[in-house]
């Protein structure tokens, strides 16, 4: 037995020498080393395996055999057979080794042999019919948000369009651009159909660089300017500028088959409602000289990443909040190049919590109905796992999508028990990991093979971690090229392409006031449980884009109602067969609600559509499954089509966004307050104590998200009625309960309308107009505000629970001792105005004239144990992932003020922070303390640092200001104490 094994060992060693691949022998030592290192890191990061293991070798063989099967189906039999022979031999040797004692490195040799065999096959794919690859050499954008790719001001300088002259790690790289075009930032480009020209976004270098203040709506700055679009020959000659708009971002260009260029732009002047520092971009088109700019889409939160479908439509990602949670807020849409027939093509799966939040960078896979895209987070740099989505499948469920990089999880998603069982056996059951690297910008070569950029780094915002890879759907991945000191982005094969179908322009020349016409064949399709004849009206509503900066910059229009004002445009009749035929105004963001005979909602639409002037379009039913046929219609077709299109019947309370005080409060004044007058001399159970006068404004509670800034106020009557209303609580990840069944929300499901039915509430009877007003308010998702100019700020509501009214005695004593110690060290003529012990107090001593109030930040105790030389007050901190904010009030021009604070890095070395001072509306501000290293206690035992700065005379004259402690580097920002001192200036008030 021993001799037999000895012979086997000898045969194995001979086989290893004999199988040395030609590809590896031809590669230089440096390239071979780079490829092997990449493979080893792939196993470690992606699969948690070592290359010197049986499992790793078998994984390569398994994935390789799946690729071999693809090649055989494609007719590349010779290449497939060659690779199969190599893998079979390696597999046989590998299995023999299970029975013998082997030396370290034996499996690793087989692993690399197998990888080279598969790599050779992958690059032999007939679909790789090009020699050169265009890509962007860049640094990753400055901040971790998917908006950053579309913001020139967020780019880190130093970028170029590059041509990789062969698909090899040691290939020569030819730089297309030169001079000033290489000093700024470059975004996602496109290559012309004849492969001779490149259109690309370029952000020029700013003459005087500033830091980019992410999240600050009033700030303009950065190291680069805004994006503009340029075109250049593939040879780099004669670059020409196509757009020139310093106030807007023009980016993500895409060649259209008719010779025009589509692009993403912020020129509609709209803002993102969850944070109005972000620009809401839409899709536009222009001629190749930059003239004749036309708006294609009506953006709400944004529409971006345009690419062409073979049928001539432009596919893009839409981001919108229309009464739905955060689960699926960025879906795939398509539109004709003239703006007609904008419709969702995939992503309407609210019931599915295991799917990605955003579908980005989608491109159609040649010869199929499928697209490849990134399953990105909302709050990352647009990266995640690679997805394949079938546009011919069910657009409202996960069955039509496939995650082809299963080790990489869907970032930022939340889970709930109600969806786990349903999908426990599906490909989506595995959550995936957040430490397996990140993919972006995939480009499909065939139905199974694609090029993408990938980074091993745990941080998705790695400045220079992204490299180019050849990948397939089976998990095979091979390095094409990795740059040194920069990232690669948006690979495009340099080859000619077949132009998509040209869809005729039916909009140009039409009077822009011409209404569109919509048709619903049978509204009962999709309304399970609703009997024919039950739907009597279709309500047409409008959601409004944000166009002005507000304080707060993110503001709920009610209490979990959502961030967008919305109102009723009108109603139209529904025929007995469920058909509807009606006019709608162009360019508006509209959605619909099916109503019963009493104008109560049966079901609502939770995204929006729009029509172009003169456009005629329609749908089958209400939330009908994708691909549903109209079914049998009466003789001669749908009844509604036998007459002219209905015109909208405006609501009796007038047009405009729904406003509680304008529409509902007058009804309460007429019908309710004679009883519900808020009398205080009665029992709380008495109807009179239920005050519906609406005379008091109170701070709005926040069911999921507080406003980003001071919390808004609502009337007390609004809050009282709200408890009797069934509406969708927007915010957080509440989309897991959607879509809701019919009658699940809105006026038909609300207790308020049931109480008011038929005079059952103390014989109170409402007119039809009053009844409709209250029902419509509920069905607009119960908003309080109807516009951005109406917002009433209540107070600065801290993003944390209030501390106990009376802090523990030891903390009170420590703070008092600290105040006394600080005051005792002040020079003559200097007064301690206010002191705040962060982490314990929200407001400084109320006895003083000057007040410090903390408006954001959470409390934390660094250590309960004493530290020599460190006051107890400095062991308590406030922290925040972005900034800890204080409002200072009670200042006067008669005194000059100094601010001092203490901070330290107790347990996480590497933090860096800065300090900013703003006007209370944040329109004006400046940095008063530059980015500073925090004292490192963990490693160097450095004590807390005391930082001080002067407040300007403008703050003293204004009487108040905002002080923000900002995180520049690290996981969060921290502060222990803050105090203000003053001296008499002799100036008059």
Positions of predicted regions on the chain:
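Conserved beta-propeller blade repeats
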Residues: 133, 183-193, 247-260, 300-315, ...
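Compositionally biased, intrinsically disordered or flexible polar/acidic segments
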Residues: 6, 819-989
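Short, conserved, GDST-rich strand-edge loop motifs in beta-rich repeat architectures
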Residues: 135-156, 201-225, 263-279, 316-330, ...
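Multi-bladed beta-propeller domains
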Residues: 169-184, 234-248, 287-301, 336-358, ...
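Loop/turn-rich, solvent-exposed surfaces of beta-rich toroidal or solenoidal domains
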Residues: 365-469
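Aromatic- and Gly/Pro-enriched helix-to-coil junctions and flexible linker segments
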Residues: 25-44, 48-55, 59-62, 85-102, ...
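Long amphipathic alpha-helical scaffold segments
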Residues: 75-175
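Beta-propeller blade signature
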Residues: 160-165, 220, 225-235, 278-289, ...
């Amino acid at each position: 037995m021993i001799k037999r094994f000895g012979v086997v060992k000898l045969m194995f060693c001979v086989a290893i020498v004999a199988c040395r691949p030609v590809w590896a022998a031809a590669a230089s030592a440096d390239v071979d080393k780079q490829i092997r290192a990449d493979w080893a890191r792939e196993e470690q990061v992606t699969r948690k395996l070592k290359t010197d293991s049986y499992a790793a070798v078998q994984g390569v063989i398994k994935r390789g055999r799946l690729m071999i099967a693809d090649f055989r189906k494609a007719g590349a039999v010779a290449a497939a057979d060659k690779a199969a022979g190599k893998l079979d031999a390696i597999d046989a040797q590998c299995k023999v080794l299970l029975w013998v004692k082997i030396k370290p490195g034996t499996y690793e040799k087989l692993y690399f042999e197998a990888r080279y065999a598969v790599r050779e096959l992958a690059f032999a794919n007939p679909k790789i019919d090009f020699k050169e690859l265009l890509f962007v050499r860049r640094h990753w954008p400055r901040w971790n948000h998917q908006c950053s790719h579309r913001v020139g001001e967020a780019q880190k300088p130093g970028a170029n369009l590059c041509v990789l002259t062969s698909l090899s790690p040691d290939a020569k790289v030819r730089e297309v651009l030169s001079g000033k075009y290489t000093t700024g930032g470059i975004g996602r480009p496109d290559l012309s159909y004849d492969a001779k020209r490149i259109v690309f976004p370029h952000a020029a270098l700013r003459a005087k660089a500033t830091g980019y203040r992410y999240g600050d709506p009033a700030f303009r700055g950065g190291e680069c300017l805004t994006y503009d679009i340029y075109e250049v020959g593939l040879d780099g000659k004669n670059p020409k500028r196509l757009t020139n708009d310093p106030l807007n971002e023009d980016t993500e260009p895409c060649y259209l088959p008719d010779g025009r260029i589509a692009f993403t732009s912020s020129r509609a002047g709209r803002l993102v409602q969850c944070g109005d520092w972000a620009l809401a971009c839409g899709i536009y088109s222009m001629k190749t000289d930059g003239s004749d700019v036309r708006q294609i889409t009506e953006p709400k939160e944004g529409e971006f990443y345009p690419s062409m479908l073979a049928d001539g439509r432009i596919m893009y990602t839409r981001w919108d909040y229309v009464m739905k949670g955060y689960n699926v807020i960025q879906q795939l849409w398509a539109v004709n190049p003239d703006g007609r027939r904008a419709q969702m093509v995939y992503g309407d799966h609210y019931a599915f919590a295991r799917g990605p939040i955003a579908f980005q960078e989608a491109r159609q896979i040649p010869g199929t109905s499928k697209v490849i895209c990134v399953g990105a987070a909302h709050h990352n740099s647009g990266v995640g796992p690679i997805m394949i989505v079938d546009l011919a499948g069910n657009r409202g469920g996960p069955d039509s999508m496939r995650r082809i990089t299963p080790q990489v999880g869907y970032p930022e998603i939340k889970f709930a028990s109600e969806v786990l069982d349903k999908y426990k056996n599906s490909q989506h059951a595995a959550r995936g990991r957040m430490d397996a690297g990140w993919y972006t910008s995939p480009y499909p070569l065939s139905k199974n093979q694609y090029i993408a950029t990938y980074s091993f780094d745990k941080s998705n915002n790695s400045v220079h971690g992204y490299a180019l890879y050849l990948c397939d759907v089976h998990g095979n991945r091979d390095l094409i090229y990795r740059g040194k000191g920069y990232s690669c982005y948006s690979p495009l094969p340099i080859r000619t392409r077949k132009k998509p179908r040209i869809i005729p322009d039916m909009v140009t020349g039409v009077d822009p006031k011409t209404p569109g016409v919509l048709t619903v064949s049978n509204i009962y399709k999709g309304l399970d449980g609703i009997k024919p004849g039950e739907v009597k009206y279709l309500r047409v509503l409008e959601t409004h884009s944000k166009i002005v900066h507000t304080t707060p910059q993110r503001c709920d229009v009610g209490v979990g109602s959502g961030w967008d004002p919305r109102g009723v445009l009108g109603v139209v009749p529904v025929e007995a067969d469920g058909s509807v035929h009606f006019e709608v105004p162009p360019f508006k963001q509209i959605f619909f609600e099916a109503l019963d005979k009493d104008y109560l909602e049966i079901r609502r639409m939770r995204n929006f559509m729009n029509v172009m002037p003169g456009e005629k379009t329609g749908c089958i039913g209400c939330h009908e499954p994708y691909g549903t046929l109209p079914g049998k219609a009466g003789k001669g077709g749908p009844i509604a089509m036998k007459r002219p299109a209905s015109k909208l019947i405006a609501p009796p309370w007038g047009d405009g966004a729904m406003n509680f005080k304008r529409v509902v409060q007058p009804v309460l004044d007429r019908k309710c307050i004679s009883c519900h007058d808020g009398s205080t001399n009665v029992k709380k159970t008495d109807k009179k104590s239920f005050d519906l006068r609406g005379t008091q404004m109170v701070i709005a509670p926040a069911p999921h998200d507080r406003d980003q800034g001071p919390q808004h106020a609502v009337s007390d009557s609004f809050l009282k009625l709200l408890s009797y209303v069934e509406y969708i609580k927007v915010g957080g990840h509440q989309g897991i309960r959607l879509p809701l069944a019919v009658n699940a929300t809105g006026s038909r499901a609300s207790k308020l309308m049931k109480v008011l039915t038929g005079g059952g509430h103390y014989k109170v009877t409402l007119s039809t107009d009053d009844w409709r007003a209250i029902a419509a308010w509920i069905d607009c998702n119960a908003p309080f505000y109807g516009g951005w100019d109406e917002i009433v700020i209540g107070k600065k509501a801290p993003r944390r629970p209030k501390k106990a009214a009376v802090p523990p005695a030891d903390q009170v004593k420590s703070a008092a001792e600290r105040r006394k110690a600080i005051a005792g060290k002040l020079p003559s003529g200097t007064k301690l105005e206010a002191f705040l012990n962060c982490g314990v107090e929200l407001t400084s001593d109320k006895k003083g004239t000057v007040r410090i109030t903390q408006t954001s930040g959470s409390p934390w105790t660094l250590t309960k144990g004493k530290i020599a030389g460190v006051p107890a007050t400095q062991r308590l901190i406030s922290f925040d992932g972005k900034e800890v904010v204080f409002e200072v009030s009670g200042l006067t021009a008669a005194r000059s003020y100094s601010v001092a604070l203490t901070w330290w890095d107790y347990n996480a070395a590497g933090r860096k922070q800065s300090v900013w001072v703003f006007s209370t509306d944040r329109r004006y501000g400046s940095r008063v303390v530059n980015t500073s290293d925090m004292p490192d206690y963990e490693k160097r035992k450095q004590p807390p640092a005391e930082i001080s700065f002067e407040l300007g005379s403008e703050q003293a004259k204004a009487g108040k200001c905002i002080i923000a402690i900002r995180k520049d580097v690290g996981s969060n920002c921290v502060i222990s104490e803050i105090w203000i001192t003053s001296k008499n200036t002799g100036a008059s008030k």
